């Protein structure tokens, strides 16, 4: 039955064009720009992310990350993208569709990060809006889920402005920055209907 099939890409997924942004899979040649942006944005990002390993910004750790993304792609478990500003090809952030669940679920989880110099300029909103047709069309997902810490007003605003609906509250849902944190749970359905 076609409904239960997985997606098999023999190559990386295509680049996705959005309003002023391009989403494309990361590659090793992105390391220097990626590491510099993450380092510059460390204090901005760490309150909202899992604890960074000590070697997180090294070339070898980035290589492992690229390999993991490749394995996730081959097994239809995840799709990673860098967000590139189209006006000058600057790397501004990243976005993933991860934890892809097939069968009767046909769902995945949206994750994202934005570099500090590019925050609050609409790039992430454009990126999320661009990846939604890929998730529902190419990947044939029925549901995209996302979670954010209740005090992360930027993420709450982003999700609500891109059609996600708040569905619940999960206590100590994820270990973020070394602490088990409560999260707001959001989802967007393929048909866009709000129950």
Predicted regions and their residues:
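Acyl-donor (CoA/ACP) binding surface of acyl/acetyltransferases
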Residues: 1-33, 37-47, 80-195
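Conserved GNAT-fold acetyl-CoA-binding loop/helix
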Residues: 46-67
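A generic secondary-structure signal
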Residues: 68-72, 134
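Short loop/turn motifs at secondary-structure junctions and domain boundaries
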Residues: 71-77, 164
């Amino acid at each position: 039955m076609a409904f239960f099939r997985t997606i098999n890409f023999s190559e990386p997924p295509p680049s996705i064009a959005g309003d002023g942004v391009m989403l494309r899979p990361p590659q090793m040649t992105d390391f220097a720009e990626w590491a510099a942006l993450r380092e510059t944005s460390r204090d901005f990002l760490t309150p909202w992310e899992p604890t960074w390993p000590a070697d997180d910004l090294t070339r070898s750790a980035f290589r492992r990350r690229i390999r993991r993304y490749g394995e996730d792609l081959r097994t239809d478990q995840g799709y990673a993208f860098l967000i590139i500003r189209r006006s000058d090809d600057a790397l501004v952030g990243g976005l993933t569709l991860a934890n892809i669940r097939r069968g009767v679920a046909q769902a995945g989880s949206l994750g994202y990060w934005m570099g500090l110099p590019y925050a609050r300029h609409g790039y992430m909103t454009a990126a999320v809006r661009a990846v939604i047709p890929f998730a529902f069309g190419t990947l044939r997902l029925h549901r995209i889920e996302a979670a954010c810490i209740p005090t992360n007003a930027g993420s709450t605003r982003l999700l609500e402005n891109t059609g996600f609906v708040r569905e619940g509250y999960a206590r100590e849902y994820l270990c973020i920055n070394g602490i088990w944190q409560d999260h707001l749970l959001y989802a967007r359905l393929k048909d866009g209907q709000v129950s």
